[in-house]
């Protein structure tokens, strides 16, 4: 939103705004709200300074009679015309109202004009009061510069954007809502009257977009938001809304700061690209794949990045409230950009020549405004080229102004560098308050439609009302309410004759000069209270494209009603006049002095008079030419009229016309006959046509049959070609297969030849290995023979000792039985009819108890009825549990006794069934168990009940071992009985050990075989 330099300067500075007043003096400001073309900023418009003022009482007194007579004559002569003209223009734009001071005293409406002395006294009193009111303590320039900040839209915008991006989402939503409710959309920069109807679409009555345009743009952006924007784009658009808020509040949208938009959008875009998870994965993946950076380096420095940049999950969609606010803000931003672009394209191009231009015409240019703003001088109100109320500065002269401007600029930069954010907030506050006052002022005068004078009904007009109705290149039209004072005391003091019935209650001064060419007329036939328009007037004799300060003063009290600053527009091409006004050497940023204004008005009037004379001469010449041309045409018509009265010529002409008619009729009849003949076809031609048609059809059939034959032949040829191609392909494939087979056969042949060449050496090596293996096997067999001999001797010893033990057991059992019988006989009680007495029969309580349970204890100490026997040192049953115990463990053998003990006398307590089933007992030995020949769990061991007594044939075993030697993977011989060793097996088949009663040995057949191989 472009800042209004006038309001900004007024808000920061309270220096003298009424001209080059003396230091320490302050002239009282008049309250004013003058507006033009629907644009206002709510700032007061001060009166002209002393340098642009004249001695009104003296000038009034010197020319009072002449002016009064002139005004009265002009009013009487042109009263009806001007009033009707003003009434016709009554529906012009209402440009505001300006009220006088509250302490202003009004004279009587029809009072007399005071004398010169009275006017001088009133003027002097007013001057003294204004001096007293303005004699405040002067402000130190250093203090003033320290409180004024130079306009820096870029810094302000970036500071506000950074602040907005740090706010939480809830506060951001509130800020966007407040911004959207205010809808700060400034005008595009050009007046609406200079644009075509295309721009009027974006132009509302108060300089803002119309309601229909806002709704349409919001709907279009909302549709685009929902259809085409994904989640990342929606979040980016939310931050773009923050950018728009920052640009608007920071003033970054002004014409010479267009780069702020690009910078802010670029900052937000870079932040979103860095925070995007997809882009991070893409960039890091390519950097790692290209080995530009290593994963270790990345993990080492990744913790330095903020947590916001390390996203682990994609962004979520914004809420619908923030989406609607962002859509509205972006839509209004797009509308403002379109309006500015259209206004810039339609605005007149600035002159590029080195000629001097009128300073008053260029007083409202943006460059001069910026220069005036940077100089920091005080200003007075006038209308700029863009239609806004601008207040240019009152310049200092020479070196003092340049030095003070540099100091002020340097101190302002120091303040901004120390506290940039607070400077931005201060600038934002000024901008917001100015726009708020602007909108509030416009809401009183422009509420959606063009304001008319009828809309002022009900407005309080106690202090009077003056407003501009039309501004032309050479005139300003205005209207006023009832400005007649009702103060009876003042009216009683007024002498009769000073203000008559036809005199106006106010007069107009332009640029401090009493303007004589002002036409003021009173509206006739206006009922009291029915209309607010009581006076209409026109200020004429003005120059185009110049700034004027129009002061409205009361005729009775000489007090100002209001002061309006107006800039006349550029004259049209048809009314363009080359100005011959001399341009001052120094450009002026305020309205001209009264003398200069009068001179310019006189020169302009003379130029207009000369132009009108020139146009009159040209019109006279044109009229003469037109009159002569009309006279020539009249003479021609008269001559033709007089020459057309001859009857003979008329008769000849009629005969000629009749002859032409007859010839035309005859030609028409001939053409009709020819048409009838063309409709009837001759029979000969019809027969010939039929014959030619039949011939054509026959030829066509032949042609079609020939085409079919050609197509058939082509298809047959194509099939043959395809078949041949397939045969060729199969032949090529077969040839390739044969070539591959030939290659493989050749390779096999070469390998066979090489193997045959190396065959003798291989046989010798194998024979040597076989001989060494046989020697090893012979050694192993000898070792086994020794072990077998020692084992057989141990077995015989065990058998002898076992027989002795069984004999001892039988003897003990017999002794025990005899002892029990004797005890029964000794302890027998007298018999009773009921039987034995309770407690007399001790052994009958356990009739089913086996004798082994009474005589057998744990196998570890082998005790029997208190008699302990030492355990056998090398008994094969040393680790076997008692066959009677139900919970005995069997770590080395099943409960069934080995087969070599069956020929010994068996105990009646040893008949126990095998816990293994028949399938397990008779299962085949696995080939992976290489030590199956010495296994304790062989099938012959479990089937020992069907075997004869233990017999061991060592010679047969040796023969079988020799047959099975030489190969580790040979199957076991079916004719050889497995060795039922009573000793526990070793844990590995590669090595084994055994011990007997009288010998020991190491090794196993399988281990020996493995070593031999």
Swiss-Prot record:
It comes from the Eukaryota. GO terms for cellular component: membrane. Residues 30-65, 875-899 have a biased composition (Polar residues). The keyword Thylakoid does not apply. Residues 1-65, 105-137, 339-367, 875-902, 953-1013 are annotated as: Disordered. Keywords: Coiled coil, Membrane, Transmembrane, Transmembrane helix, Ubl conjugation pathway. It is a multi-pass membrane protein. Residues 993-1002 have a biased composition (Gly residues). It is found in: Membrane. Belongs to the acrB family. Component of the regulatory network controlling carbon source utilization through ubiquitination and deubiquitination involving creA, creB, creC, creD and acrB. Involved in resistance to acriflavine, and required for normal growth on a range of sole carbon sources, including fructose, cellobiose, raffinose, and starch, and reduced utilization of amino acids, including GABA and beta-alanine, as sole carbon and nitrogen sources. This is Probable ubiquitination network signaling protein acrB. The lineage of its organism: Eukaryota, Fungi, Dikarya, Ascomycota, Pezizomycotina.
